[in-house]
Structures are given as C-alpha cells and as structure tokens.
Amino acid sequence: LIKERNDVYSENIEDLELKLVKASSNAEKEEILNEISYIKNNYDLECKTETTLAEYGYPLAYVKINVDNINVIVYENEPDNLKAVNIIKVVMNDTNKGLPVSLHFKS
C-alpha cells in the first residue's frame, strides 16, 4: 500500500507540475500551487504518522488522509480495543486534523 501511495503521489505531483507549466493565468497557477502544497503536506503527514506508529510498536501501518476522514490500516496479529484506542490517539495527535479515524486491523 505504501509503495502504491508513493507511486500515485509522484504521478500526481508530476501531472500538476506539467499543468503549472502550461497554465496561462496567475489565478490558475496559484490554484495548482495550492493543490501541490495540499498534496505534499498530506503526504508528509501520512509518512510522519506512520513513523510515529512504528515508534509505538506498529511498524506495519498505513495512513491515508482523505478530505473527510483518515484511513488507517495496521497489520497486527492480536488486535484489541486498547490497541485500537492507542492507535487512534496517536493518529489524532499526529495529524491534528480533527477528522474521524477509520481503523482497520489486518493479520
């Protein structure tokens, strides 16, 4: 999942950079630059949160920030409610987005 996200991120940034070169108005350029900034900020935050989760003992975690929620997938052999609460707290503190967290455990 992380490799797929990295590939999509790279493709999206490349596409937006091409659009930026072709943009004719300053308003259009500003809109594209804002979109690039939004994508980069979310990507950096996803990676930071995954690193924090690894530090808390969840090295196999995937975080995806969406417009209306944050999806988290954690590979864990023995999930329980306490682990879920701890993971959600870490994600909420790290992202500081105020978005609901959708947590899924996989074994």
PLM-predicted stretches and their roles:
Residues 1-96, 100-107:
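Bacterial N-terminal Sec-type targeting sequences
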